[in-house]
Design a protein with these regions (language model features):
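Glycine-rich NAD(P)-binding loop of Rossmann-like domains
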Residues: 114-147, 174
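Phosphate/diphosphate ligand-binding glycine-rich loop within oxidoreductases
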Residues: 41-115
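Short acidic low-complexity segments
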Residues: 28-39, 50-53, 172-187
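N-terminal glycine-/charge-rich "phosphate-binding" loop or analogous flexible N-terminal tail
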Residues: 1-41
Length: 309
């Protein structure tokens, strides 16, 4: 029984050896290695090539090497009848929590302006409201979003969350559905996007959304680059409708060298590292989910392909 792995070349051999050690009962092969496609039962993938998964006639399960599954669903020839499992866990949640809290605090305390003043050798003292007067909004209340919202509330921020369906999170005012979206946006000074990427959320961070935020609001996008209409953000920054942005994900990755975000004084660019999967803990989570699936046990990270999350 063969498990095939598709991942970037930098860590491919490590992943193969680590998963083989965790799953000795399986024959782990890299995507481009020789093997009999009829023997493949499991595929562990990150950004697999279009049409690649359909070539395994006996494939039983697909595992995403991360919490996001859009990189799998984008395949027009995806065998959509197969179970799809994402990879989550404490490690990924902790990393996302750290990143989001860091950048909410950075924007709340106006550190970009202080850093710019340092470059001018200017002693700039800014008075900020206390955290309990700063309204933070988290879009997307899945495992990562709910944890970040809860953590921001524990830091003292006035936190709201928005999702398609109702949630109940201690310390967080929860909004649900399109009919309460404008109300959520109107009270949000720092907006964190942690939505899954679906056809309904693609391009959601656009001029229309920015206009419904308070003037001078800030944006943090740690979901997917396709959530953001980049030109609309640049225009909103130029007009002052948006004060600053921290972006970890982009439509094109790596971000092209000539992209205006690189040099923009009000945009912080990070290279998709907010919740980068750690091979040790991530490998264990993947192996645990595969074993649960093979034993016919419930898999908590099983996703609904039609919903997209």
């Amino acid at each position: 029984m063969t498990l095939v792995v598709h991942v970037g070349p930098a860590r491919a051999q490590w992943w193969k050896e680590h998963l083989q050690g965790l799953l000795p009962e399986l024959d782990v092969r890299l995507w481009d290695e020789p093997y009999d496609v009829a023997d493949v039962r499991q595929a562990v993938v990150w950004k697999p090539p279009a049409g690649g998964l359909k070539r395994f006639p006996n494939l039983e399960v697909i595992v995403s090497m991360g919490a996001g599954i859009d990189h799998v669903l984008v395949d027009p020839e995806l065998p959509r009848h197969l179970p799809l499992i994402r990879t989550t866990g404490f490690d990924l949640t902790q990393r996302m929590r750290e990143y989001v809290c860091l950048h909410v605090l950075r924007l709340h305390r106006r550190l970009p302006e202080i850093e710019a003043a340092q470059g001018r050798r200017e002693w700039l003292q800014l008075v900020n409201p206390p955290a309990y007067e700063r309204k933070v909004g988290v879009m997307g209340l899945g495992n990562l979003g709910a944890d970040c919202a809860r953590s921001l509330s524990m830091l003292g921020f006035d936190v709201a969350g928005w999702a398609r369906r109702d949630h109940d999170i201690e310390g967080v005012e929860c909004f649900a559905g399109n009919d309460r979206f404008d109300e959520f946006l109107a009270r949000t000074e720092i907006l964190v996007c942690l939505l899954p990427l679906t056809e309904a959320t693609r391009g959601i961070l656009d001029a229309s959304l920015f206009a419904r935020l308070p003037k001078g609001a800030c944006i943090i996008n740690v979901a997917r680059g396709e959530h953001l209409v980049e030109r609309d953000l640049l225009d909103a920054l130029a007009s002052g409708q948006i004060r600053a942005a921290a972006l970890d994900v982009f439509h094109d990755e790596p971000l092209p060298h000539d992209h205006p975000f690189w040099d923009h004084p009000d945009v912080l660019v990070t290279p998709h590292v907010a919740s980068l999967i750690d091979p040790v803990s991530g490998g264990k989570a993947i192996a645990d989910n595969i074993r649960r699936f093979m034993r016919g046990e419930p898999v908590p990270d099983l996703v609904d392909i039609e919903r997209g999350y």
